[in-house]
Design a protein with these regions (language model features):
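Extracytoplasmic/periplasmic substrate-binding proteins
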Residues: 75-76, 265-368
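Beta->alpha turn/N-cap motifs
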Residues: 62-64, 132-136, 236-238, 287, ...
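A local structural motif
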Residues: 84-103, 122, 203-208, 271-285, ...
Length: 481
């Protein structure tokens, strides 16, 4: 089966109109949904690369997380520009960073436009590496714009052997692996120790887990927390991933969107929590949500995966941010007042994959970056020890899990041990190319229902309208009976 056409590649992100997509691919009239399988990766782009390689490495991403990992842990880094726009390597290669925020599909839209122009771009302007997320990984890896990490770039089975299998599966099509990552992203429930002690009489992670081990128990604790004037969750979106990661089938079957019953359980719970005052009516990433994680917050806990602990929650917990001279230490805000437990269901959230772009003239450098930053056990272990990120090397993580490692931010808890168990339960078999757009549209459509501005049927209709505007090739929506 052929890979995603240029037309459907664009439609998968809702990036352009049909007419613009037709122009981009010479008038193709195909409107089928992206295929779930593809032919083996083309090695033509790799064979076109000059043996000597280029002297500019263009990397595209949506925030500075990978940029920080690269600058801090890639051994070939020689110099970093003051404004961080470029990084110079030991061999003189200049890494140019292009960072476009994720909001409203902005990153994908700009990336898609650049990839469509890759063939005609000057060598030093071509994208060499770009980053993708789990929610839309299949859109890119099931296309001609990404190189096979083994056949085209040169990584070996031995290089990749230590990685979690799911991190390889999600970026593989017909046995062709098209990306690699330094992180695994199992999810846990991060709770305030002081609030847990007030509500449950204990802050011990093992004991707290017994109170939160299924949704009925979780709801009971929400009622107990409310009785003491706490919110169980901050807002509408907090529990969403825990439900959406436990669905029975992908969002899309052919050209039909099928809403899973488990997604509707999230709707029912969130409506109940909103009506009963168990949440603070915040939205993911808004100022209220961030404040609820800090010193003035009165929220029991937050569903977070690995990156969220060190990349978001820690920063939000501080009274004085690091940028303003604050230190990451007990005494600054509520640093040390969080802990984690498994929560009611296993889930994952996010994950970032490194892809080599077809047409790059820097194959050897891409290979070295991938080897060092995603396959090197010592580097993976050091990243975790330094940053608390959970890295993609099973042996290294098991070693830390079994050690006396502890997180001061989490009150001395070894959260890596819990993440190591949760990582074994990750199932990405239902991931698809439309996930980001459908998840966002669904959450947005139902917020008016949660707040009482529309009824449930209207929220459903609004979701259908939104996704058909975003993805014209999707023809029907089926709701659970």
């Amino acid at each position: 089966m052929k890979k995603i056409s240029r037309r459907n590649f664009l439609l998968a992100s809702g990036a352009v109109t049909i007419s613009a997509a037709l122009t981009a691919c010479g008038g193709s009239s195909s409107s089928t949904a992206p295929a779930s399988s593809a032919a083996p990766a083309s090695s033509a782009a790799a064979s076109e690369a000059p043996a000597a390689g280029g002297k500019v490495l263009n990397i595209w991403c949506w925030n500075d997380e990978f940029q920080s990992r690269f600058n801090d842990y890639y051994p070939e880094v020689k110099e970093i520009a003051a404004d961080k726009s470029t990084t110079t390597l030991n061999d003189g290669t200049v890494v140019k960073w292009t960072i476009n925020a994720n909001e409203n599909n902005n990153y994908q839209n700009k990336l898609d436009e650049a990839l469509l122009s890759q063939d005609s771009a000057a060598d030093d302007d071509k994208i060499d590496i770009f980053l993708i997320e789990a929610d839309y990984a299949l859109k890119y890896v099931d296309s001609d714009y990404v190189l096979d990490v083994k056949a085209d770039i040169g990584l070996t089975d031995s290089d990749l052997a230590g990685q979690y299998q799911y991190t390889k599966d999600i970026v593989s099509v017909d046995g062709s692996q098209r990306g690699t990552t330094w992180q695994a992203t199992p999810g846990l429930f991060a709770y305030r120790r002081s609030i847990a002690k007030d509500v449950l009489g204990t802050d011990d992670p093992t004991e707290v887990q017994t109170y939160l081990s299924d949704w009925d128990k979780f709801n009971d604790v929400a009622a107990q927390a409310a009785a003491k004037d706490y919110k169980m969750l901050s807002g509408f979106d907090d529990a969403y991933r825990t439900f959406s990661n436990n669905v029975a089938a992908p969002w899309v079957d052919g050209t039909t969107v099928k809403v899973d019953p488990n997604i509707m359980k999230w709707v029912d719970q969130t409506k109940e929590y909103t009506d009963k005052g168990y949440n603070n009516k915040s939205s993911l990433w808004d100022s209220q949500w961030a404040a609820d994680q800090g010193p003035t917050g009165k929220v029991f806990g937050f569903f977070y995966s690995t990156w969220g602990i060190n990349f978001t929650l820690l920063g939000n917990s501080l009274e004085t941010p690091v940028a303003e001279g604050g230190k990451e230490e007990v005494g600054n805000g509520i640093y040390g007042d969080y802990a984690v437990c498994e929560g009611p269901q296993p889930y994952y959230w996010g994950g970032t994959w490194i892809c080599g772009a077809a047409g790059s003239d820097n194959i050897e450098t891409i290979k070295d970056v991938m080897q060092k930053l995603t396959c090197d056990e010592a580097i993976m272990k050091q990243i975790t020890m330094d940053t608390q990120d959970y890295t993609n090397n099973e042996k290294a993580m098991e070693e830390i899990a079994a050690s006396d490692y502890s997180s001061a931010f989490l009150g001395g808890q070894n959260h890596i041990a819990l993440f190591a168990e949760a990582a074994k339960k990750i199932d990405m078999s239902n991931a698809g190319p439309y996930d980001q757009g459908l998840n966002e549209s669904f959450q947005n459509a139902f917020k008016d229902y949660f707040t009482g501005n529309v009824d449930e049927d209207t929220a459903k209709a609004n979701f259908e309208t939104a996704i058909k505007e975003k993805y014209p090739e999707l023809t029907d929506v089926v709701w659970p009976a």
